[in-house]
């Protein structure tokens, strides 16, 4: 009888097997609304749990420092080719272990310590790697930050241009972790050209929407594009670097290896290749369109229930609830929805009076539950559940009712029904 990986795990380490099962059950029983999370396909999971994890493969396809890479080369080349096809890029490096690693490789290629970079303020929706003082990007480089308009809570390109003209950064960064609106990459390139800066687009959150043609494409306008491969792209956790400049591509490759990494994780790269193949199918565009439609349905019903949204809505997969009008902090709201098995995250909002550890916002996203098959009607119901819980924070009756409604949704849309690790009874 053929034994599966799960069989070996359960017999070798039942404690870990049981904890994995516990996490599987948690994912099944919760509404996952963290905007940066998603559920990969079973095929991606299989690729990541394969014998590819055994192979060291420093270098690039055809140029390895180790022997025995003939099949590894084919897998990585497939991932590269598919990434280039998805995004229309001339060059792709699929080796970065994460989006942060991808960004750091770009910095190593384009900058010297002490150079000036300019990105969005973290509290307005930016990312740690875009110059936050707690990140290496904020320690090695001079940093100036732009934000959103206090009136519209959206990007003001005239203000960004004025700041860029004053600060003269060597690298201008666009792309965000908590910005619910469309990004105009063409305007950013115009600003970058005017001040003689490189333009980096970090599309970690919107890569799947870009791949589906549902968000403007950064490739024609940006010197470099980085992304994670999970989130809306629905692949394994990892990073990706894209450019249409072949010479710059060579520098970027060297900045990944040997510049910032050693051996690539070829089992993860195989998972990336599988996910990229999935993203090339027509069904993925249908999925991405539903992600946006579901986020808008969630936003609309939250507003109908009296909750305020940053920028008054969303154009993509995420939205930010401004909780000040209901006298809650983001930390409190996060804890309240968690009591009814909804997973979200507290988040700063523009001009937030609270600390980053408390915040005034709650970030919500639609990708994961769209993967489970939920549509507009279900996201409207999710908005009602969230509203009921936040607007009646002290009601045990409401809490129990919300928990039952969450359970009903999870039961209707099962997650990974084929997965289970048999665990022997622990002594």
Curated annotation (Swiss-Prot):
HAMAP family: SHMT. The lineage of its organism: Bacteria, Bacillati, Cyanobacteriota, Cyanophyceae, Nostocales. This is Serine hydroxymethyltransferase. PROSITE patterns: SHMT. The modification N6-(pyridoxal phosphate)lysine is found at residue 231. It comes from Nostoc punctiforme (strain ATCC 29133 / PCC 73102). Homodimer. Pfam families: SHMT. Its main location: cytoplasm. Catalyzes the reversible interconversion of serine and glycine with tetrahydrofolate (THF) serving as the one-carbon carrier. This reaction serves as the major source of one-carbon groups required for the biosynthesis of purines, thymidylate, methionine, and other important biomolecules. Also exhibits THF-independent aldolase activity toward beta-hydroxyamino acids, producing glycine and aldehydes, via a retro-aldol mechanism.
């Amino acid at each position: 009888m053929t034994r599966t990986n799960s069989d070996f795990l359960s017999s070798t380490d039942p404690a870990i097997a049981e904890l994995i099962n516990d996490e599987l059950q948690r994912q099944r029983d919760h509404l996952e609304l963290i905007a940066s999370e998603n559920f990969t396909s079973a095929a991606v999971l299989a690729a990541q749990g394969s014998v590819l994890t055994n192979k060291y493969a420093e270098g690039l396809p055809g140029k390895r420092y180790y022997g025995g890479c003939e099949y590894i080369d084919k897998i990585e080349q497939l991932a590269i080719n598919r990434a280039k096809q998805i995004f229309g890029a001339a060059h792709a490096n699929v080796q970065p272990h994460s989006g942060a690693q991808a960004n750091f490789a770009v910095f190593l290629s384009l900058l010297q310590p002490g150079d000036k970079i300019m990105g969005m303020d973290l509290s307005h929706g930016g990312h740690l790697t875009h110059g936050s003082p707690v990140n290496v990007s904020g320690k090695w480089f001079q940093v100036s930050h732009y934000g959103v308009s206090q009136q519209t809570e959206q990007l003001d390109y005239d203000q960004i241009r004025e700041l860029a003209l004053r600060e003269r950064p060597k690298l201008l960064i666009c792309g965000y972790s908590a910005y619910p609106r469309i990004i105009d990459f063409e305007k950013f390139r115009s600003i970058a050209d005017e001040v003689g800066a490189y333009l980096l687009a970090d599309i970690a959150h919107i890569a799947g929407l870009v791949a589906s043609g549902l968000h403007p494409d950064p490739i024609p306008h940006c010197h470099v594009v980085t992304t994670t491969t999970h989130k809306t792209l629905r692949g394994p956790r990892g990073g990706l670097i894209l450019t249409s400049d072949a010479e710059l591509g060579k520098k970027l490759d060297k900045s990944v290896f040997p510049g910032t990494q050693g051996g690539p994780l070829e089992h993860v790269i195989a998972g990336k290749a599988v996910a990229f193949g999935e993203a090339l199918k027509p069904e993925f565009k249908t999925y991405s369109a539903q992600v946006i439609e579901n986020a808008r349905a969630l936003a609309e019903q939250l507003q109908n229930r009296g909750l305020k949204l940053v920028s008054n809505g969303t154009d993509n997969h995420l939205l930010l609830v401004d909780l000040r009008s209901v006298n809650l902090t983001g930390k409190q709201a996060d804890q309240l929805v968690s009591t009814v098995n909804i997973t979200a995250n507290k988040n700063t909002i523009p001009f937030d009076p609270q600390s980053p550890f408390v915040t005034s916002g709650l970030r919500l996203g639609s990708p994961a539950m769209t993967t489970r098959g939920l549509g507009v009607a279900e996201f409207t119901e999710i908005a009602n559940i969230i509203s009921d819980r936040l607007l009646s924070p002290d009601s045990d009756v409401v809490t129990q009712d919300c928990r039952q409604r969450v359970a009903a949704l999870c039961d209707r849309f099962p997650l990974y029904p084929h997965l289970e690790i048999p665990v022997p009874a622990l002594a």
